[in-house]
Each structure stands twice: as structure tokens, then as C-alpha cells.
Amino acid sequence: MGSSSGSDVEAGFAKLQGEDFEYYMQTYSIILGRNSKKSTVDVDLSSLGGGMNISRHHARIFYDFQRRRFNLEVLGKNGCFVEGVLHLPGNPPIKLDSQDLLQIGDKEFYFLLPVRSILGGGPPIGPKQNVNYPVAAHYGGIGKKGGLFRGREREYYDEEEYDDDDDDDDGTGGKKMRRCDGAEGGGGYGGYGSCGSSGKASISGQLGQ
């Protein structure tokens, strides 16, 4: 059941994309950290090469229904980087935009949203089941400043459709999306905003087995 098929993709609210892993978010809230004898987390960054500075409960990504957006709550004492800015425990939750680069410990990965979520101003569809699918695979698609991977891309989405109803925010609501050509099963992973914004390096991997 933990595959990267189209049905799993459409049910996902968001995706975490690293250089050597993908994780499809299937619930409204997930915990990132490291597994211990007493408890487990949704995303075990320690096992993915996150290093020794990962707390058991290091961060939480959740959907804010009132503001219709995803947020990152920092729990671990060593904090998290979002787009190169360090955020520490006790700070207000950080708004996450598609293609934001996150770093927890030594692990870097991107936060990606599907186009359906962006167009609708909220999660695309309810989860088919309360399950998360971690997938260790390379997959085409992200672009950021000095991105981790490189590849082909094409524009396919305009930022004006993204309405987060937060005019008093930092103005980072809408972003122009790009989509990778190529990769089996359709380019751009079923419409995830995943190939970077204008003027940024793109990433393209190969679909893992």
C-alpha cells in the first residue's frame, strides 16, 4: 500500500522531497524527529542522515484550517531552518509555501504542495486512510536557489490563483510554479508545485523502483 502510485498522490495533502527520499503527507499533522524505544515519529530524520542534532520530536507540520495554509511548528532545541532562516522553539508557527527549503539537523528537503491544494486554497481531498507513505526514491522535480538536483522543466501555473487570505503576511503567498518534463507516470508528479520558481535552478531525479 505504501507505493507512489497515482491514487496515493491524489490523496496526499503535501509532499516532502529530499535528495534521497520522498514522503507523502496523508494527514493534517505530522511529526518529524527520530524514533526511540518509547515512541515513533512520522518522519524519522535520524535514519535519513539527519545527524545527531535531531530531537525525538523536532518539528510538526500541520494544516491551519482557519488561515487555510500549512505551518511548521519548531519543537526541537536546535531549531529548524526555513529558506535559510533559523527558527527556534517558542516562536510562532512558520507559514510554509510550496518549494520552501527546510533543514533539520543535517537533512535538507523541500516542502511541496499539489496544484489542487493551491487552486482550492486548502487540502485537495480528504485522506483515503489515516496513513503516511514514506518512499525512498529519486523523483523529478524541485528547484530552488542552488538546488540539490538539476533537470528540465516548464512553466505551468500562475501565482495569482493562490489565495491564502492573509494580506498582513510577508507577501510570499503566491509563487510561479514549474513542472518537470519526463519521469514515468506523468511529469511534475500529478501536479505538485515541484520544479521551482522563475529564475531558480531546477531539480530532476529518476523515479525509483
UniProtKB/Swiss-Prot annotation:
Residues spanning the membrane: none
KW Cell membrane (keyword) present: no
Keywords from the named record: Nucleus, Transcription, Transcription regulation
CDD domains linked to this entry: FHA_FKH1-like
Compositional bias ranges of the Acidic residues kind: 157-171
Polar residues: compositionally biased ranges: 200-209
Cellular location(s): Nucleus
UniProt domain FHA: residue ranges: 30-87
GO CC aspect terms: nucleus
Keyword Manganese: no
Functional note: Transcription regulator that may be involved in the control of the pre-rRNA processing machinery. Can rescue the phenotypes of slow growth and defective rRNA processing in the yeast fhl1 null mutant. Shows transactivation activity in yeast.
Protein name: Transcriptional activator FHA1
Gene: FHA1
